[in-house]
């Protein structure tokens, strides 16, 4: 049976690295709906090559390697999820607002360039909610992950 939600166009979303880890490394229960949305195509996950490089680097952090090992989950499997589900975009122009954490700026820039929802738990990003809304970006902390769908 089809619902009105099924008929809606997919939502463009930018997922920061910690959200990606929640989806496929930590199996965060609060991220289940977002993971399902990505896997079923209800989310158009936008990312850049630099975001993939960051994910690959983070997957080598000792605390992440420990988690991957405990789950018998190769880092390549996480990167394969990225490659399978992401819609790769060129680097975006600088957004009108700068994040105090330079590592997060690329996520903000891409979300602003595509008027996409941005998913992050980073305090330096979350404090920019009102400014990002002025740019057409809905900022969703993990627990409200599908609120804009």
Report residues per predicted region.
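Short, well-structured N-terminal submotif of metal-dependent ribonuclease cores
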Residues: 1-47
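Alpha-helix capping/helix-boundary segments
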Residues: 19-20, 51, 124-125
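Short, flexible loop segments at the rims of nucleotide/cofactor-binding pockets, characterized by
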Residues: 21-24, 68, 93-100
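Residues that scaffold the ATP/ADP-binding catalytic core of kinase and kinase-like folds
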Residues: 23-24, 58, 67, 128-129, ...
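Residues at secondary-structure transition points
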Residues: 29, 46, 73, 98, ...
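PIN-domain endoribonuclease scaffold, especially VapC-family toxins
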Residues: 37-94
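Active-site neighborhoods of divalent-metal-dependent phosphate/nucleic-acid chemistry enzymes
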Residues: 83-119, 124
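Acidic, PIN/NYN-like endoribonuclease modules and their adjacent C-terminal/linker elements
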Residues: 105-108, 115-117, 123-149
């Amino acid at each position: 049976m089809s619902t009105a939600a099924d008929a809606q166009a997919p939502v463009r979303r930018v997922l920061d690295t910690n959200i990606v880890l929640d989806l496929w490394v930590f199996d965060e229960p609060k991220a289940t709906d977002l993971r399902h949305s990505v896997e079923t195509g209800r989310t158009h996950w936008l990312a850049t090559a630099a975001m993939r490089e960051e994910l690959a680097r983070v997957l080598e952090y000792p605390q992440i390697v420990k988690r991957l090992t405990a789950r018998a989950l190769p880092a390549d499997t996480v990167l394969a999820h990225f490659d399978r589900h992401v819609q790769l975009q060129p680097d975006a122009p600088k957004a009108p607002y700068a994040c105090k954490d330079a590592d997060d700026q690329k996520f903000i820039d891409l979300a602003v360039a595509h008027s996409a929802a941005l998913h992050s738990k980073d305090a330096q990003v979350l404090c920019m909610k009102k400014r990002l809304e002025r740019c057409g970006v809905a900022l969703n902390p993990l627990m409200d992950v599908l609120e804009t769908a």
